[in-house]
């Protein structure tokens, strides 16, 4: 009791290893690219890079919206209803997290064949498979945090179940749902393995990074990596900040 407890300091020291491990490569790649600024400027003005970035941003955004459209209702059902096979449904939702992404590409190609091959539909299909669990689980957790008594009060006052959902449940769960949408977007824009197999074209920035690295080496692929990472991190931070303000 009399001694000073250093437990938190110990835990902070241990945890700082991961912080440094994650932050260091980001700092290093930005620093090295800053020293090769001419290459960065040249890459930014490359029409192929611009188109690839546009493809990545548009398909990731479409994926996040589709994840919300179908994931929010499913998350509500999982939060409010106990039914036979619920554990199986939850397991199916989490399966994409553990499947290797190249295998995901093969699975989608075997299932849908030419319907998604080398198309925007294929890119979105690959992104959706790996990112949907984040939207669904975040929505479920958000609705679980909503006190059911509030919903019951609204129902006793004459509100329909649908009106109660939109006026009570959804607004309270919205921060968690928004976090899930951000994670779905981030997971989609970071996907490479499945997209390489399903839809090499139209080319996304992720695939272009791999192509440049394989064909031209590290120096050629680094500027695209920095640009994609900068855009992704910028959007991610801004959205997180907006959600934080909404919560407070």
Curated annotation (Swiss-Prot):
Its main location: membrane. Residues 53-239 form the ABC transmembrane type-1 domain. Disulfide bonds: none annotated. It comes from the Archaea. InterPro entries: MetI-like, MetI-like_sf, Mo/W_ABC_Transporter_Permease. Residues 1-9, 78-91, 137-164, 245-248 are cytoplasmic. Pfam families: BPD_transp_1 (PF00528). It is a multi-pass membrane protein. It is found in: Cell membrane. The keyword Transmembrane helix applies. The chain crosses the membrane at residues 10-30, 57-77, 92-112, 116-136, 165-185, 224-244. Keywords: Cell membrane, Membrane, Molybdenum, Transmembrane, Transmembrane helix, Transport. Residues 31-56, 113-115, 186-223 are extracellular. Part of the ABC transporter complex WtpABC involved in molybdate/tungstate import. Probably responsible for the translocation of the substrate across the membrane. Belongs to the binding-protein-dependent transport system permease family. The complex is composed of two ATP-binding proteins (WtpC), two transmembrane proteins (WtpB) and a solute-binding protein (WtpA). NCBIfam families: tungstate_WtpB (NF040839). This is Molybdate/tungstate transport system permease protein WtpB. The lineage of its organism: Archaea, Methanobacteriati, Methanobacteriota, Thermococci, Thermococcales.
